[in-house]
Structure formats: C-alpha cells, structure tokens
Amino acid sequence: MIRHFLADDDLTPSEQAAVLDEAARLKKDRYAARPLTGPRSVAVVFEKPSTRTRVSFEVAITELGGQPVVLDAVGSQLGRGEPIEDTARVLSRYVAAIVLRTFGHDRITTLARYATVPVVNALSDAYHPCQALADLLTIRERKGGLDGVRLAYVGDGNNVACSLLVAGAMAGLHVTVASPAGYQPPPAVVARAAEIGEQTGGRVEVVDDPRTAARNADVLYTDVWTSMGQEEETAARRRAFAGFTVDDDLLALAADDAIVLHCLPAHRGEEITASVLEGPQSAIFDQAENRLHTAKALLSFLLDAAGGRGIP
C-alpha cells in the first residue's frame, strides 16, 4: 500500500516509534538497510532553498543503495508553471519515491493525490515532519526516552512548532509553545495535538510568556523568527519577538540537565545567543546529524509499506 508522509500524524504513534528505532539502528550501522539497491531512484524536489534537508536526503538515498535525482524550480518545468499534478504522474513513472520541499502545503497534498509512489514532505509552510523525527531521536538519545519529557518551544508558531506539537504528543511529550499573540500555532493544530495526547499521555499547551514555558523544561527549542518568504516582515517580527531570545537567563530556568535544540540555520543574537548555541547544553549539531538517520529510516518504512524492501 502506498503511504505518504505529509504531516506528522500520517504515522501512528507506534509507527513513529518504529521509525525512530530504525533510525537509531542505522546510526550505528549506516549501511544496514539497502532497500533502494538496484539502484532505484528517488526524486528530491526543491521549490524552497535548503542545506540540511537537501544533503541529508541525498546522502540517505545513496546510503540506502539508490540514486537521488535532484530538481529545483529553476532547472525544471515546475518553475515555468507546469501543474504539480502532471509532475506527480510523470515522476511516479520514473522513481520509487518523491521528496518535496515547498511553500504552500496544498502543493504537497496535490502532489500526493496524483502520485503513485510515496511522497515525503521535506518542509511546507504548515509542517516540517522530517525535522520533528530528528528532534525526537535527539531527545531520546540525550534523555534515555521520550515519555513525559518536557519540551519548551520558544518563538514563532511556525511549521516546526506545529510538527513538534503533533509529533511530541504522539511520543508522549509535554510540549509547551511560547509565542507572542498573532504568532501562535493554528488552533486546529493545537486541538489535533491535544486529541492525540489524550490517547498517548502527551500534553500540549500554548502560552505567551517564554519564562513560563522554559521553567523546569527538559528541552529548550527555538527557531528563526523570520522564515523564508517573510523577509518583508523582519522588522515587525523583531519587535514582536523581543524578549523571546533563548539566552543564558532563559536557559537557567530550565532543568539543570536541559538540552537546547534549534533546527538551523540560526541567527545568533536574535532567537538564540551564541553562548547558548555553542554551550555545553547544546545538542544542535547532533540534532542536525540525525536528519540523515531519520530520513533513511523514514524512506525504508515507506518503501516497505509500498512493497519495496524497507524496514526488515
């Protein structure tokens, strides 16, 4: 059966846990899974610039035995207005899966509707589910588990925050998002995460005070205040997010053994200070590495579901 990964809850909680288990296994033995041996190809389509997402997926596909085929808007007909549904049907004839990083979430849902191979959301304006998998793996490594871990996200209630709410609830985390009024996660996403938490023991909360969120947190997480495509809002966002910087004072409110996460790229001196990013509690570069291992595990899972020799 063809499965897509467009939002975090396209996996069940048990499937999410299985993907994390496989990612941990592949981190220890990077060539233990070869579901793309042939090589089979995977299309990696970027309508939005990337460093970590692009490199992690290209390396993941290669280490799984496959061949990445990288497309961007400039070098393909997508940039000239070819309908995404046509692209979906054509690429499905060539490749084993399609990875898309885009702006509007409707782009990826349309792609999945017309594709006949698995589709992976490598980032949309609504969700960043691949990032959340890497975040959970990093937390599990550092904390020895996920159930009951207190995660405080401080900053823009963006795609990263939305995925942390949903994926965190699925894993049994207690997730608190601190964002100023007007920049909080969509109520529908918060409600969905709360609904999931009722089944898993996870809890979610949205507040407007970063100190409230950070107090006794096991994980302190932040992201940029201004995402790609929002550059005209930079000045207004800096004003709105004044007081939301993850600095030494905010970190001091968290648990003594708290870790700090950031999905990168970081703007030192804005959402996070250099001293925290480079400090002993930072797990940020382990987190970046885990994008690779979780990408491999996710692709293996989706290929297995499609009958393509994925997770053993």
Swiss-Prot record:
Subcellular location(s) per record: Cytoplasm
Residues holding L-ornithine: 159, 223, 227-228
BP GO terms, sorted: arginine biosynthetic process via ornithine; citrulline biosynthetic process; L-arginine biosynthetic process
Pfam family, one: OTCace
Keyword Ion transport applies: no
GO CC, alphabetical: cytoplasm
Binding site for carbamoyl phosphate: 50-53, 77, 101, 128-131, 263-264, 291
GO molecular function annotation: amino acid binding; ornithine carbamoyltransferase activity
Enzyme class: transferase
Pathway entry: Amino-acid biosynthesis; L-arginine biosynthesis; L-arginine from L-ornithine and carbamoyl phosphate: step 1/3
Main location: cytoplasm
UniProt entry keywords in alphabetical sequence: Amino-acid biosynthesis, Arginine biosynthesis, Cytoplasm, Transferase
Summary of the function given for this chain in its UniProt record: Reversibly catalyzes the transfer of the carbamoyl group from carbamoyl phosphate (CP) to the N(epsilon) atom of ornithine (ORN) to produce L-citrulline.
Protein family per UniProt: Belongs to the aspartate/ornithine carbamoyltransferase superfamily. OTCase family.
Name assigned to this protein: Ornithine carbamoyltransferase
Lineage: Bacteria, Bacillati, Actinomycetota, Actinomycetes, Acidothermales
